[in-house]
């Protein structure tokens, strides 16, 4: 055999080896997390409680790796990692010198790909750009194929990655939520836009399949499962499942509702949130003539045991945990009255008085909008530590002061209360919009609000009533400004609200007739994140005094009427929402 013949033979061998996996049977385990929301550590930092965490997820993942072999396991996160817990906040904004803890954890845990979520974008460019660089340096792509640069039309983040396991080529594509522009200020996602997942995901899948010739295709989207009727931009999971071709697994997220939907050709997995479950998909391949001849798919959810953690991982990140704990437990002031969010559902409350007081102090605000941000949050009076500020205000929302007419303010409040209450003519009805239905998280029936309580905005700076016997449009009667000045529907006012709300979050601005796509034209001033305002307030005032935060000359007064209907009906509904232990 001459050299040319030998070279040709070698080339043929090389090409044959690249043509596809060897004939035989293969099985891969796809493990997924999503909406981790900063639950990196298993401690609540105070009180000695144990919570579900990435520490416990690691133990769960390793048990599968031990059973089937590390090379047969693929680990993917579907986004919303960098917001929601003290640890994320600390490494996002407080200690920006130490390498961010999440990329280090993702490397330690062996993640193959991470998807960008809307709350990751909410942290701002400095944070997510840094995290993206760190992840990429560890060989972990930060995926968001629908985040398109304004300057050149190319993706801002990575679109996909290819894994090669035992000769099998596995493509993972990732996409962020398409609705981000309706929630977040453009300042947080400057330089890019977020495309609709339909038809973009299919287009990108087709490109990747044509270029990379993968044997397995996984799509990870930071989008809720949804209803599949095409009506919700933030919930496109089932819309995708109905239309995608050439995809084996669709990983969904965002809504915090754990669910799996198996089928012979495409499995949907949504692991819920906060490390409660690990999504688990299995794909078994039969390869004949170096091509995939058949596939079998299955999916399930694996419950995570919060008490069973990886002790080696705990040791590895112990110094990081101590740094977060020290930050979390430092004293910041005194609270002179209990703060609870549940009281906000029935009228004015100390909790919302505080939010309104700080918001309306953002000059030149005359009015403020605010809602209870947790369903049943509570902080007991006494010494405050920084951890309490996360309970009072769990999100990284900035405060915007926005121009609105008096009529827009009234229409906004009418829209808010229409989500909150029913029209009733006697105490026998449900004054609160609640229903007895299955809880997606527990599987048990319980009473809950039909709408999201964090969209139940009330107003500070006004004196008004809300008549529960009247329909939407005539419930809200604004008597005056807090200081007694007349309120004029034709006049323009400066209104303080969160960046989330101003950008269209919750849809209330739209229902008031305001185009949030042009909100920059209405913004007259911006302020830092609300938690920073609260921290600075405590530095200046030392304590939170109910007499100060409840000053009617500053925040006004509002109430539901008529009392003879409201009082007994509210008591009945609140007992259903928050039953007393017997």
Can you name each region flagged by the protein language model?
Residues 14-17:
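C-terminal motif of bacterial Sec signal peptides marking the signal peptidase cleavage site
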Residues 1-7:
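Bacterial N-terminal signal peptides that target proteins for export
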Residues 19-306, 312, 346-358, 368, ...:
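Acidic, metal/ion-coordinating pockets
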Residues 23-29, 38-47, 51, 55-66, ...:
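Catalytic centers of hydrolytic enzymes
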């Amino acid at each position: 055999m001459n050299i040319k013949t030998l070279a040709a033979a070698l080339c043929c061998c090389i090409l044959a080896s690249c043509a596809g996996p060897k004939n035989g049977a293969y099985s891969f385990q796809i493990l997924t997390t999503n909406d981790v929301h900063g639950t990196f550590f298993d401690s609540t930092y105070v009180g000695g409680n144990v919570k579900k965490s990435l520490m416990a997820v690691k133990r769960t993942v390793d048990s599968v790796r031990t059973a089937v072999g590390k090379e047969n396991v693929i680990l993917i996160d579907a986004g919303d990692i960098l917001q929601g817990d003290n640890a994320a906040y600390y490494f996002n904004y407080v200690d920006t010198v130490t390498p961010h803890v999440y990329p280090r954890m993702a490397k330690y845990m062996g993640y193959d790909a991470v998807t960008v979520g809307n709350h990751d974008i909410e942290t701002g460019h400095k944070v997510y750009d840094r995290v993206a660089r760190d992840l990429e340096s560890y060989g972990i792509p930060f995926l968001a194929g629908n985040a398109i640069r304004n300057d050149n039309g190319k993706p801002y983040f990575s679109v996909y990655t290819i894994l090669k396991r035992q000769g099998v080529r596995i493509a993972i594509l990732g996409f962020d939520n398409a609705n981000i522009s309706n929630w977040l200020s453009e300042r947080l996602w400057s330089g890019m836009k977020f495309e609709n997942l339909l038809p973009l995901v299919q287009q990108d899948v087709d490109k990747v399949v044509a270029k990379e010739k993968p044997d397995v295709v996984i799509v990870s989207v930071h989008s809720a499962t949804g209803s599949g009727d095409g009506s919700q931009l933030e919930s496109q999971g089932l819309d995708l499942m109905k239309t995608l071709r050439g995809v084996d697994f669709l990983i969904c997220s965002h809504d915090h509702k754990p669910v799996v939907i198996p089928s012979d050709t495409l499995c949907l997995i949504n692991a819920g949130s906060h490390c409660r479950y690990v999504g688990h998909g299995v794909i078994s391949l039969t390869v004949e003539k170096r091509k995939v001849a058949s596939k079998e798919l299955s999916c399930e959810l694996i419950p995570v045991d919060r008490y069973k953690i990886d002790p080696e991982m705990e040791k590895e990140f112990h110094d990081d945990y101590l740094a977060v704990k020290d930050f979390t437990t430092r004293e910041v002031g005194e609270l002179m009255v209990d703060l609870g969010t549940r009281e906000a559902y029935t009228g004015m409350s100390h909790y919302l008085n505080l939010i309104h007081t700080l918001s309306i102090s953002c000059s030149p605000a005359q009015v403020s909008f605010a809602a209870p941000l947790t369903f049943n949050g509570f902080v007991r009076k006494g010494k405050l530590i920084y951890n309490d500020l996360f309970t009072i205000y769990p999100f990284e929302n900035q405060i915007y002061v926005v121009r609105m007419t008096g009529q827009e303010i009234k229409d906004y409040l009418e829209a808010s209360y229409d989500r909150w209450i029913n029209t009733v003519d006697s105490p026998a009805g449900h004054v609160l919009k609640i229903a007895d239905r299955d809880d997606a998280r527990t599987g048990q029936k319980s009473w809950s609000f039909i709408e999201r309580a964090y969209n139940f905005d009330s107003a500070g700076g006004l004196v008004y009533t809300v008549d529960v016997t009247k329909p939407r449009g005539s419930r809200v009667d604004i008597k005056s400004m807090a200081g007694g000045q007349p309120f004029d529907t034709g006049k323009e006012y400066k209104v303080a609200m969160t960046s989330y709300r101003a950008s269209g979050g919750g849809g209330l601005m739209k229902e008031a007739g305001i185009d949030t796509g042009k909100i920059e034209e209405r913004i007259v001033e911006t302020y830092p994140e609300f938690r920073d305002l609260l921290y600075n307030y405590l530095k200046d005032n030392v304590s939170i005094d109910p007499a100060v935060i409840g000053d009617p000359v500053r925040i006004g007064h509002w109430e539901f009427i008529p009392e003879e209907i409201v009082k007994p009906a509210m008591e009945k509904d609140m007992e259903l929402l928050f039953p007393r232990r017997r």
